[in-house]
Swiss-Prot record:
Listed EC numbers: 2.8.1.6
Cofactor note: Binds 1 [4Fe-4S] cluster. The cluster is coordinated with 3 cysteines and an exchangeable S-adenosyl-L-methionine. Binds 1 [2Fe-2S] cluster. The cluster is coordinated with 3 cysteines and 1 arginine.
Co-factor(s): [4Fe-4S] cluster; [2Fe-2S] cluster
SUBUNIT field: Homodimer.
Domain of life the protein comes from: Bacteria
Family designation: Belongs to the radical SAM superfamily. Biotin synthase family.
PANTHER family named among the record's database cross-references: BIOTIN SYNTHASE, BIOTIN SYNTHASE, MITOCHONDRIAL
Protein name: Biotin synthase
A GO biological process held by the record: biotin biosynthetic process
Length: 352
């Protein structure tokens, strides 16, 4: 193992060397990833997030993996943008069960001018509760990123999904360059980036390596890198894809950890299909973030109590973050709710 692998943050990875990491013996790869992980993180701490779908279904994008796409008949019930108060109530629940970050996702190509004021109120309200805030709203322009940053948004999620070469086989309604441009706007506005991809869409090893290279060779690494395993949903074009080999998925996590040593690598969608042994291997490979709770946008996620039971058996604890004192925290929640009740924007955006 080279010293540079454990000590240096790089932005010049080449395909051949990344493929060589993937092709190592499994135990060697995990040892290397765990060594890198321990150099930058407490190996027995995992960051815990909760994800809420604030607007579900009827998305105009044609992402072949997604049950929210309006192009496919998946039986998913379309829902309007959630009211701000309801979002804050869900955020309070997430806080109560141990989440430190609250992520809000909307099935949009991009947020409209009509919806942005409501979105900004959600950010401000959740932030006031002492939670980190994250949103995924689709493509953003420069003004929207500035507005979100000013409202206090900590993270913006915008996945690259796969390699540039394979991307056109999965999505045709948005270009890869548009995704990269959104990430650039987010970074320029001073927010942190959450960006990763999906395994199990029919991609090759070159594509998996290519995705990680795109992320690792950005001017700054994403602070959070979600690695998703395809959740096959009837009605989507990828519903019959072959399952991802569990060891291949663990390899993806390990290589992500080596390439982006200071990033949180998130064990994301597909965790419901993983047994406890596979999840334990994922943490050994350097995954140190999970989504917590019963739903991951529109697909099932392991129940929160099961997560805590597994953490206890593995000696893992949720990653701590700076908190307000209980009294101040409760006051912040109450104040946020009062402000929302008195705001003219405290209504369903779809009726505006």
């Amino acid at each position: 193992m080279s010293a540079s692998t454990t000590a240096t943050t790089r932005h010049d990875w080449a395909l051949a060397e990344v493929k060589a990491l993937f092709q190592q013996p499994f135990n060697d790869l995990l040892f290397q990833a765990q060594t890198v992980h321990r150099a930058h993180f407490d190996p027995n701490r995992v960051q815990v997030s909760t994800l809420l779908s604030i607007k579900t279904g009827a998305c105009p994008e044609d992402c072949k993996y997604c049950p929210q796409s309006g192009h496919y008949n998946t039986g998913l019930e379309k829902q309007k943008l959630m009211e701000v108060q309801k979002v804050l109530e869900e955020a309070a629940r997430a806080k109560a069960i141990g989440s430190t970050r609250f992520c809000m996702g909307a099935a949009w190509k991009h947020p409209s001018a009509k919806d942005m004021p409501y979105v900004l109120e959600m950010v401000k309200g959740v932030k006031a509760m002492g939670l980190e805030t994250c949103m995924t709203l689709g493509k953003l322009d420069q003004e929207q990123t500035k507005a979100l940053a000013q409202a206090g948004l900590d993270y913006y999620n915008h996945n690259l999904d796969t390699s540039p070469e394979f991307y056109g086989s999965i999505i045709t309604t948005r270009t890869y360059s548009e995704r990269l441009q959104t990430l650039a706007y987010v970074r320029d506005a001073g927010m942190k980036i959450c960006s990763g991809g999906i395994l199990g869409m029919g991609e090759s090893l070159d594509d998996r390596a290519g995705l990680l290279i795109q992320l690792a060779n950005l001017p700054e690494h994403p602070e959070s890198v979600p690695i998703n395993m395809l959740v096959k949903v009837a009605g989507t074009p990828l519903a019959e894809e072959e399952d991802v080999d569990p060891f291949d998925f663990i390899r993806m996590l390990a290589v992500a950890r080596i390439l982006m040593p200071k990033s949180h690598v998130r064990l994301s969608a597909g965790r419901e299909q993983m047994n406890e042994q596979m999840q334990a291997l994922a943490f050994m490979a350097g995954a140190n973030s999970i989504f917590y709770g019963e739903k991951l946008l529109t697909t099932a996620n392991p129940q929160a109590d099961k997560d805590m039971q597994l953490f206890a058996r593995l000696g893992i604890k949720p990653e701590a973050r700076e908190e307000h004192a209980d009294e101040v925290h409760q006051a912040a929640i109450e104040q946020a709710l009062v402000e929302q009740r008195s705001s003219e924007m405290f209504y369903d955006a779809a009726t505006a």
